[in-house]
Amino acid sequence: MDSRTEIEALQQILHHEWGADEQVDWTAVEAQLSTPLPADYRDFMAVYGGGCIDDLIVLPPLPTGNGWQASITGHIVGFRELWNMDGGAPGVELGADRVLPWGSGCNANELGWLMTGRNLDQWPVVVWRRHENPHWALFNCGMAEFLRRLMTAEFDECPLSDLSLWGRVGTFVHHEEQERRFHAGLDPMTGEPNPYTGMFNRQPARAPRRQALVVPPATPKSGLAVSASR
């Protein structure tokens, strides 16, 4: 599928009622990242924007300026440190400068692209799974297709070390809607009244409160082959 077809296929299962056009300045993004980004990701930002599918954060490219701290630029250093720490995905010779994050969450999974060449729309997805060995796996699909196949269980097995979205379609909520709900005393994801309102200082509840990933201690690397799904 091309990028437009992939985002349309994703919209067939993942409602965008609580999404919003991120209105990204793609020229500024390319200047910050030294690369353009795949078309399906750009389409996702136009339809859904940055936010969460349940516990899976889809990162906007740049900081939002509204207190929601997750962004691709904020996660690059930690994501690449994980790649270096494990020596990358088994069977992949590319260095850490060739991986770029786009998602995070679901019990410490980190998602990104392996920048394999100039054809951005052919970049496969790489995933770091905290509870798997080897930690890194490679999937021969783009970001939008990955999300769709995760929620429709179309991989041979769950590509994450967390089953919360495996074969189950979550709810997407844009980061601005999450913040609005939080300050209104509502649960940022469900919109239901939050019984804990007023007990804590009101910081954005669903946004990750870190600028970079927390890199865990190194573990012995397995010699298993790359886990790939086609």
Residue ranges and their predicted role:
Residues 1-109, 159, 176-229:
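A surface-exposed partner-binding patch
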Residues 127-157:
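Compact, glycine/acidic-enriched structural inserts
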Residues 51, 108, 119, 152-153:
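Short loop/turn segments at secondary-structure transitions that flank enzyme active sites
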Residues 18-19, 118-121:
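Helix-boundary capping/turn motifs
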Residues 114-119, 127-129:
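Low-complexity, glycine/alanine/valine/leucine- and proline-rich hydrophobic stretches
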Residues 146-177:
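Extended, acidic-biased charged interface segments
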Residues 120-122, 134-135:
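A short local loop/turn or secondary-structure capping micro-motif enriched for an aromatic residue
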Residues 110-115, 124, 137-139:
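A short secondary-structure junction signal
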